[in-house]
Each structure stands twice: as structure tokens, then as C-alpha cells.
């Protein structure tokens, strides 16, 4: 399936038409994984014991950068995902784009397909267990590192930090993530 995916995308679809959509969970107990301390002393930081409910970020990404996003308390359900597609993603889709989703059950609703195809776009699903083919996963890794550094301890601060972290993912980053996942993009003028 993975080889078929690479053949399909490499041979038939312009990578600049791809729109990857996924979700990332986070909470208020994120802390840096590495720290500096004076020689001979242990680096320390405080982390709340009660993480509270997860905050889920639903977002899209193209080769040009991060697209529209939505944060919700709790996890992604079919209703939450349909709401994201209908109110946030679909209004900015352009005819001819190809929306790529992973195989989460919430992504497979008929309403999701109708909303995407109704905008003149195509819907594709990644092969199972293939986060390495999804460049938004690499963007989320960068976002999570920035969230750890931010150390937000309230839900409101976490959502604000998510917005700031998403703004840091530049076009150059997105293009690099696409290329690292094997998608060929035309060279950009310097």
C-alpha cells in the first residue's frame, strides 16, 4: 500500500495541491525535555500533577504553510471533525486541491467526503500506520517543542501558545517537511 501511495502521489498528483489534515493532543503539563543547570546540579522544573482534559488542535497544512485550525477540549469525534471541515477547512479549500487524511474513524464520515468534494476537491487517505508520509506530523513535532518551552499552565494560555507556535511554522519549514516525507516540490527562487 505504501509503494502504491508513493507511485500515485509522485506520478499523478502535484504535491503543491496536497492539503494534509490531522489533529494533535496537548495538555497543561507539557514541560521541556532538556534543560541546562550549573555543573554538578540537576536541572529541575515543576509540572502540575493534574493535567486536566486534553486540548485537541485540528489543523491543515500545505506546502505553503499551516492552514486554518480549531482547538477543542477533549478528543476528536466524528461530530467535531465534521464541524472543523464544514466551518473552518471547507471555506478555504480551492477547487483542484487534494485533501489527505489518516485513517482515524472520525475522518471517514460520508458528510466529510461530501463537504470536501462539494468544494471541487479530491479526498485521499494515507496508507495505514504511515505517519512518515504525513508532513503535518513533523509540523506538530515543532509545535509541541514550542509548547513545552512555553510552559502554559491554563487551557487559555495553552490555546494562545498553540496559535503562536503555529505562526512559527514558516513556508520554508513546510516545504522541508513535505520533501522529507518524499513529496517533490518545484524549486523556490531565492
Feature map (PLM): residue ranges:
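Short functional hotspots at interaction and active-site rims
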Residues: 1-190
Amino acid at each position: 500500500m505504501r509503494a502504491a501511495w508513493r507511485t500515485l502521489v509522485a506520478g499523478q498528483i502535484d504535491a503543491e495541491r496536497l492539503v494534509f489534515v490531522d489533529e494533535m493532543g496537548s495538555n497543561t503539563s507539557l514541560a521541556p525535555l532538556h534543560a541546562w543547570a550549573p555543573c554538578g546540579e540537576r536541572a529541575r522544573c515543576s509540572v502540575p500533577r493534574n493535567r486536566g482534559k486534553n486540548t485537541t488542535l485540528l489543523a491543515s497544512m500545505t506546502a505553503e504553510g499551516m492552514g486554518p485550525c480549531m482547538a477543542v477540549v477533549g478528543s476528536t469525534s466524528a461530530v467535531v471533525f465534521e464541524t472543523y471541515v464544514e466551518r473552518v477547512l471547507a471555506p478555504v479549500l480551492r477547487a483542484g486541491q487534494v485533501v489527505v487524511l489518516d485513517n482515524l474513524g472520525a475522518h471517514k464520515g460520508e458528510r466529510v467526503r461530501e463537504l470536501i468534494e462539494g468544494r471541487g476537491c479530491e479526498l485521499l487517505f494515507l496508507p495505514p500506520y504511515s505517519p512518515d508520509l504525513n508532513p503535518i506530523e513533523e509540523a506538530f513535532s515543532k509545535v509541541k517543542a514550542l509548547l513545552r518551552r512555553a510552559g502554559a499552565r491554563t487551557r487559555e494560555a495553552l490555546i494562545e501558545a498553540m496559535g503562536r507556535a503555529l505562526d512559527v511554522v514558516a513556508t520554508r519549514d513546510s516545504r522541508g517537511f513535505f520533501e522529507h516525507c518524499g513529496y517533490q516540490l518545484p524549486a523556490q527562487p531565492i
